[in-house]
Amino acid sequence: MLCFLSISVAAESLKNERILIITSYNPDTEKTNANLKEFFKEYERLTGYTANICIENMNCKNLSEGMQWKDRMAKLLENHKATPPNLIILLGQEAWASFLSQTSDMARKTPSMGAMIGTNAIEAPKEKDINLRTFMPNSSEYPSFTNFNIVGGIFYKYDVERNIELIRKFYPNTKNIAFLSDFTLGGLTLQALVRKTMEEKYKDLNLILLDGRRSTVFEVCTQIQKLPPHTALLLGTWRIDSSDNYVLANTTGPISKAAPNVPAFSLSSIGM
């Protein structure tokens, strides 16, 4: 899915604005590159000018290095202190969460936008020695971050409630929801949203976490095979397992075949 940022202010005034784009991943990665191309194309169409745009890269890899991201973001912002931007655009969940953990005036007061992110977010942990494999953060919707000057963006809406209702419509005897997530910030953010929704609205259902932060793809397969009766599988994300290795497409096959009689629904575009 391409995120398209449409700018509808006077073209001449845009030329005088400094725009800082901070990406979670290398700008050459497919999704990031596609989003940047669309932004530059539209911006140049409106202004005929792109020299006022600067791109920084957090070079995030996996969640095991997540405790470094807050400081990494702070250093990137510090690099632009002499000539502060008029707008900061964050591409990716890692950049977004790291930005929302900042306390500087630049981060809090500069107009900011997000893309390639969900409407829900988690803040990076304040403790330096926290174990990210067991960290259970709270989920917040982006409008709740009132101490930041968030002016807009492109957000994915993950509707957990409608998915649960769909599961109950097809399988009214469902007693357990098994949620699959991986060892990425996106996986942890989705898991936090699912936990929050289940705790607030579905206390009659039992939530089973198939957590890639602590399980390999093969361990998850075993867990799926041992799921109790009346369980539905809700798919979140699956790119990196507990071994810190990216999961290849041919390794997701065993998950989909682990228990073919267990009904499966997808919260994201994972599909499997």
Residues of each region from the PLM?
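Bacterial N-terminal signal peptides
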Residues: 1-6
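Short hydrophobic alpha-helices and adjacent helix-cap/hinge residues
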Residues: 9-272
